[in-house]
Swiss-Prot record:
Subcellular location: Cell inner membrane
First-tier enzyme category under EC: transferase
Major subcellular site: membrane
Family named by the database record: Belongs to the glycosyltransferase 4 family. MraY subfamily.
MF-aspect GO terms: metal ion binding; phospho-N-acetylmuramoyl-pentapeptide-transferase activity; UDP-N-acetylmuramoyl-L-alanyl-D-glutamyl-meso-2,6-diaminopimelyl-D-alanyl-D-alanine:undecaprenyl-phosphate transferase activity
Originating organism: Fervidobacterium nodosum (strain ATCC 35602 / DSM 5306 / Rt17-B1)
UniProt protein name: Phospho-N-acetylmuramoyl-pentapeptide-transferase
UniProt membrane topology term: Multi-pass membrane protein
Length: 306
């Protein structure tokens, strides 16, 4: 990576450190804060009113740096569009003064619509394949719709306690370095990590700002699109075990309650289960991030020693 690119990435972090306090103060003046869902843990009640939609800042910094570094348009537009969906969700939540924003079907419809464009764009320069197996193009479109939208929502589910979604994303994105084939791929990894790290300075417990759906939906879409672009769909599964665990815990919880009338966990997603067991938020973030990275390292070690 050249000095120019490194300086651009460093500037993202520094600007984030400078901008976030101003963003937080501005949101407080407008009284635009997070509403806590009623079915969530009572431990979170004190967080109500905390400025949200912090994703606006790190997405903006990433897009500007991405344009400077001439990153692929798929990544830039993915951040913008999924960030926009999340912003609409946050906006509705704030205006209507409730924890839920857009309806689930509305978010999914918008996510599916844009993922079709992602699949079309990617197929202009790579073969229609899934996990290295050639498939009909319609199946690749379907796979892209499910993967990108699925990861977008998985990251959103993980964003339930201070710092969790951000640190899990960082520990999921960094391992892709080991399979990067060009400087552009390295840049695509760090162009999102650097401003996100500046966000995490203010999102660590007690959080002064939340990323909101603006940030979480965009992050999940970004990492899955990056994996598709670089033919790393299989690696994605091993680099994001916590995102998968959070999603699976919700599916199991809902299925168990519908079929058996019993809950498997004290609360889902599973990070809330550990909260109600008495784990502090810092411990959950540390343990989840460590396991996320450890599983990725084991996969890399296995792959490199085949």
């Amino acid at each position: 990576m050249d000095i120019y690119s490194a300086a651009t990435l460093l500037a993202e972090f520094v600007l984030g450190i400078i901008i976030f306090p101003k963003f937080i103060d501005y949101m407080k003046k407008l009284k635009l804060g997070q509403y806590i869902r009623q079915e969530g843990p009572d431990l979170h009640n004190y967080k109500e009113g905390t400025p949200t939609a912090g994703g606006i800042v790190f997405i903006s910094l990433t897009v500007i740096a991405g344009l400077i570094l001439k990153l692929p348009k798929e990544l830039i537009f993915t951040l913008l569009f999924y960030g926009f969906i999340g912003f609409l969700d946050d906006f509705v939540s704030i205006v209507k003064k409730r924890s839920l924003g857009l309806r689930a079907w509305q978010k999914l419809a918008l996510q599916f619509l844009f993922s079709i464009w992602i699949a079309y764009t990617i197929l202009q320069y790579r073969t229609s394949s899934i996990f290295g197996i050639t498939v009909p193009s319609w199946l690749f479109y379907l796979f892209t719709m499910l993967l990108v939208s699925g990861y977008s929502n998985a990251t959103n589910l993980t964003d339930g306690i201070d710092g969790l979604a951000g640190w899990v994303f960082v520990t999921s994105m960094i391992p892709f370095m080991f399979f990067s084939k060009s400087s552009m791929e390295y840049k695509a990894i760090f162009v999102i990590i650097m401003p996100l790290l500046s966000f995490l300075v203010y999102n660590t417990r007690p959080a002064k700002v939340f990323m909101g759906d603006t940030g979480s939906l965009a992050l999940g879409a970004y990492i899955s699109t990056y994996a598709l672009m670089t033919n790393n769909e299989l690696s994605l599964l091993f680099f994001t075990p916590i995102f998968l665990l959070e999603t699976i815990s919700v599916i199991l919880q809902v299925s168990s309650y519908k079929l058996r009338g019993k809950r498997l966990f004290k609360m889902a997603p599973i990070h809330h289960h550990f909260e109600l067991l008495g784990w502090k938020e810092e411990k959950i973030v540390g343990v989840f991030s460590a396991w996320n990275l450890a599983i990725a390292i084991f996969y890399i070690a296995f792959f490199l020693n085949r």
